[in-house]
Amino acid sequence: MAVISMKQLLEAGVHFGHQTRRWNPKMAKYIFTERNGIHVIDLQQTVKYADQAYDFMRDAAANDAVVLFVGTKKQAADAVAEEAVRSGQYFINHRWLGGTLTNWGTIQKRIARLKEIKRMEEDGTFEVLPKKEVALLNKQRARLEKFLGGIEDMPRIPDVMYVVDPHKEQIAVKEAKKLGIPVVAMVDTNTDPDDIDVIIPANDDAIRAVKLITAKLADAIIEGRQGDDAVAVEAEFAASETQADSIEEIVEVVEGDNA
């Protein structure tokens, strides 16, 4: 049984790509058709590739992989943080700082500074410092937490990186590739898929679509770490009377949505 059903993908709007004029021709094989100037992603392929991504992430987690979730645009930020935390992993959901991976030593120094400021508050140091200095420290902590809080406890450079919108996160992808870190990503019709190791053709601009795919990969990590019983089997995964499971039905839904 597929880990994500066609019905779930349709309801989340995973099939909607970008305007045809903004497409990347390398994504042609993942596109089913065009409707009203919008490319429609072939969801039968999305189902297949989502299965492959799930298996990849589950197997990596079973081998104690450290996974970094990356998604800095507003549609992805909440899901990336929530699902990374739920699966016991790490995330960056604000601006990617250049060198986060390739200059890991420097990043660790900034993380150490963040932890130092937190300790200063906890051990009472703030109480004996001038208010102005405390205000500056709090400002520094807030900034460090914003950009590095999601990787504060990451023990090492990640073994796998999951990315929402690699077109936007090009620097992150390049750093991962330079270090030989495999990249799993939601890839929309405007993206070059060549640098992605495990592709999930999908709309990466809709909050529901991002949540659906990201949550499923978090499930894969949990299963890899804890076994099948750790992941609840949702009733939606079973065939239903309303499930669309043919290309023709997808087109009908798309035409209806764009009417």
Swiss-Prot record:
A GO term for molecular function: structural constituent of ribosome
Cystine pairings recorded for this chain: none
Pfam family, one: Ribosomal_S2
PROSITE patterns: RIBOSOMAL_S2_1
GO cellular component, one term: cytosolic small ribosomal subunit
GO biological process, one term: translation
Keywords for the protein's UniProt record, in alphabetical order: Ribonucleoprotein, Ribosomal protein
HAMAP family: Ribosomal_uS2_B
Family recorded in the similarity comment: Belongs to the universal ribosomal protein uS2 family.
NCBIfam families xref list: rpsB_bact
Protein name: Small ribosomal subunit protein uS2
Organism: Streptococcus pneumoniae (strain Hungary19A-6)
Gene: rpsB
